């Protein structure tokens, strides 16, 4: 499964590990993905999303119904 937030669209970034001697080795910075179930009152069911804590705050602010319509408009199946 890809490491992409379903709400914010955050993806892994690439960068360097830096040792004390400033040697650079490539690495990935992964988003803090969490799997969370949300109750959708309009559909009378739970929806499981893979999202970051920022995505959870967006759902708290806008509401799960608005966020789900945005996700479905992008063509993702939820």
Curated annotation (Swiss-Prot):
Xref: PANTHER family: 39S RIBOSOMAL PROTEIN L28, MITOCHONDRIAL, LARGE RIBOSOMAL SUBUNIT PROTEIN BL28M
UniProt keywords (A-Z) are: Ribonucleoprotein, Ribosomal protein
InterPro entries associated with the record: Ribosomal_bL28, Ribosomal_bL28/bL31-like_sf, Ribosomal_bL28_bact-type, Ribosomal_bL28_sf
Record-linked SUPFAM superfamilies: L28p-like (SSF143800)
Question: What family classification does the UniProt entry report for this protein?
Answer: Belongs to the bacterial ribosomal protein bL28 family.
Protein name per the record: Large ribosomal subunit protein bL28
Gene3D superfamilies tied to this protein: Ribosomal protein L28/L24
- Give the highest taxon in the source lineage: Bacteria
Q: What are the recorded Gene Ontology BP terms?
A: translation
Which GO CC terms are listed, alphabetically?
A: cytosolic large ribosomal subunit
What are the GO MF terms of this UniProt record? Answer: structural constituent of ribosome
Q: Which Pfam families match?
A: Ribosomal_L28 (PF00830)
């Amino acid at each position: 499964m890809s490491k992409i937030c379903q709400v914010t669209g955050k993806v892994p970034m690439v960068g360097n590990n830096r040792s004390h001697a400033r040697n650079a080795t490539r690495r990935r910075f992964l988003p803090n993905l969490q799997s969370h179930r949300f109750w959708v009152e309009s559909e009378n069911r739970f929806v499981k999303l893979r999202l970051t804590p920022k995505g959870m705050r967006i759902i708290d602010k806008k509401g799960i119904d608005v966020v789900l319509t945005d996700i479905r408009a992008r063509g993702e199946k939820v």
